Amino acid sequence: MRLTAKQVIWLKVCLHLAGFLPFVWLAWAINHGGLSADPVKDIQHFTGRTALKFLLATLLITPLARYAKQPLLIRTRRLLGLWCFAWATLHLTSYALLELGVNNLALFGQELITRPYLTLGIVSWLILLALAFTSTQAMQRNLGKHWQQLHNFVYLVAILAPIHYLWSVKIISPQPILYAGLALLLLALRYKKFRTWLK
């Protein structure tokens, strides 16, 4: 049975809750001692992982809609992408304000040079910024065929963001490897599209 437009609306409501509730949990954890002895790192990793989860969810929508024969699922893709950008922005902000501090923001450029994984992160965020800014139907009409060309850069983010995560952790752990593996799997599902580009 295919989803109806009304069911998709309720699904969007649920997805908005899924995007907002992690923020509620994080705020509670900060105020009630739910973080470790290094709360700044906890906040950075939590916001970054949440952004990655929404990135993977965004990439999942197209193959899921195709294989499950649920075309209306595509209507949730923009919503998930915007939540990905929102959490990526919180991730960047937590690094800039909590790690560097307001008085040391001038060091950000130097950090990008000395820590290449930060470069991957900021490139990913800039791409997400462009995609979020052009995600409306009006921008899609204005950009025409260039809109899809621009939004294909989400696949580059799907490569850079997991590498950024893997590179940023001090020790090898299963979680960043899992995210990288899921990203590769979701990209592999699009092999026909990539093969067409190479022709």
From Swiss-Prot:
Entries under InterPro entries matching the protein: Fe3_Rdtase_TM_dom, MsrQ-like
Regions that span the bilayer: 8-28, 82-102, 116-136, 153-173
The keyword Disulfide bond belongs to this UniProt entry's keyword annotation: no
Cofactor(s) the protein requires to work: FMN; heme b
Main location: membrane
Domain of life per record: Bacteria
GO BP term, pick one: protein repair
GO MF terms held by the record: electron transfer activity; FMN binding; heme binding; metal ion binding; oxidoreductase activity, acting on diphenols and related substances as donors
Subcellular compartments: Cell inner membrane
Alphabetical list of Pfam families matching this protein: Ferric_reduct
Membrane disposition: Multi-pass membrane protein
Free-text comment on the cofactor: Binds 1 FMN per subunit. Binds 1 heme b (iron(II)-protoporphyrin IX) group per subunit.
Any one GO cellular component localisation term in the record: plasma membrane
Keywords in alphabetical order: Cell inner membrane, Cell membrane, Electron transport, Flavoprotein, FMN, Heme, Iron, Membrane, Metal-binding, Transmembrane, Transmembrane helix, Transport
Record text on subunit structure and interactions: Heterodimer of a catalytic subunit (MsrP) and a heme-binding subunit (MsrQ).
UniProt similarity note: Belongs to the MsrQ family.
Function: Part of the MsrPQ system that repairs oxidized periplasmic proteins containing methionine sulfoxide residues (Met-O), using respiratory chain electrons. Thus protects these proteins from oxidative-stress damage caused by reactive species of oxygen and chlorine generated by the host defense mechanisms. MsrPQ is essential for the maintenance of envelope integrity under bleach stress, rescuing a wide series of structurally unrelated periplasmic proteins from methionine oxidation, including the primary periplasmic chaperone SurA and the lipoprotein Pal.
PANTHER family in UniProt: PROTEIN-METHIONINE-SULFOXIDE REDUCTASE HEME-BINDING SUBUNIT MSRQ
Protein name: Protein-methionine-sulfoxide reductase heme-binding subunit MsrQ
Origin species: Escherichia fergusonii (strain ATCC 35469 / DSM 13698 / CCUG 18766 / IAM 14443 / JCM 21226 / LMG 7866 / NBRC 102419 / NCTC 12128 / CDC 0568-73)
Gene (name only): msrQ
